[in-house]
Amino acid sequence: EEQVEARELGRSIDAYLDTLPRENRNIFLRRYWFGDSVKDIAKAFSLTQNAVSVRLNRMRGGLRTHLIKEGYYE
């Protein structure tokens, strides 16, 4: 049962990530999947570290809202 819930949560996260513009999705994945630093991501995308941090913060907020709507958080 836990494996089923984990798979469903993974699908919900993927569904959220699919709504993001490609660049933002790549930034999110590089930070939270591959563990790249904000500094390295900023260099790779020709952005400031602050711009990357702001985008990540907004995406985390969007993910939180999405997961609440899906019933994963209250």
Which stretches of residues belong to each language-model region?
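Acidic, proline/glycine-rich intrinsically disordered inter-domain spacer in sigma factors
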Residues: E1-D18
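ABC transporter NBD signature
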Residues: P21
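Flexible coil/turn residues that form the inter-helical turn or adjacent wing/linker of helix-turn-helix
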Residues: F34-G35
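A short pre-motif secondary-structure segment
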Residues: I27-R31
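DNA-recognition helix of helix-turn-helix
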Residues: I13, N24, V38-K39, K43-K69
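Intrinsically disordered, low-complexity basic tails/linkers immediately adjacent to helix-turn-helix/homeobox/MYB/SANT
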Residues: Y72-E74
